[in-house]
Amino acid sequence: PLRLVGSEMCIRDRIYCWRGGQRSSSFATILSEIGWRPSLVDGGYKNYRNDVTQLLHKTKPPYQFILISGHTGTAKTEIVNILNEFSLQTIDLEGLANHRGSVFGATATKQSSQKLFESRLFTRLQSLDPRKPIILESESNKIGQLAIPSMIWNIMKLSPRIEVNAPLNERAKYLTTTYADLILSLIHI
C-alpha cells in the first residue's frame, strides 16, 4: 500500500520514461489524483540525455567561469561552498562527482556514474544565470574516474583563476582535520 507521510504532498522531481510517452503520463495522472503535482520531461529520457549531451559536449555553453586554484590543503572546495552561501554562483564539481578530487580521492560512498555526474552538472548549470560568472574549483580533466565534459573542460582551461596560497604547516593542519577519516582508517590497517 502507498503511504503518505507529512502534510505537504508534492513531488518536485520530474517524471520520465524512455521517450516521454504513455507510461510516464499515466503515472503522472495517478500521482496528480492523489494530490501531488508532478511534471513530465518532454520527450522522455532520450530527449533529456540529448539536451545534456548537447550542452556539455557539443555546443559551447554560454557560461563564464572563475576558477579557484591552489595546492592540496588550501580549502578550495570549502571556499567555493562558502561563496555559494553568500549567493554567488558556484558549482562544486567534486560534490557532484562524489569524490574528494585531491590526492586523497574517493569518499566513503561510491562515486557517481558518468551519466549521473553529467545530469547533476546539467541541472546545476540550468539553475544558474549564464550572464553572471560561475565560481568553481580548478580540477584536472578527471575527478576520480569521471571525466569533466569536454565543453565545460574547454571553458575551464581558458578561465581566469584566483590562486589560494597557504603555508605548508597550515595546509597540513587543515588536511589532518578534513581527512581525519583517512588517518583513522590507516591506523586500523
Please give the residue ranges for each predicted region.
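Phosphate-binding P-loop
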Residues: 56-63
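Glycine-rich phosphate-binding P-loop
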Residues: 67-84
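Single conserved hydrophobic/aromatic residue that forms the stacking wall/gate
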Residues: 1-6, 11, 187-188
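Conserved phosphate-donor/acceptor-positioning beta-strand/loop module used by diverse small-molecule
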Residues: 156-175
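Catalytic cysteine-centered active loop of the rhodanese-like fold, especially the PTP/DSP P-loop
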Residues: 8, 12-41
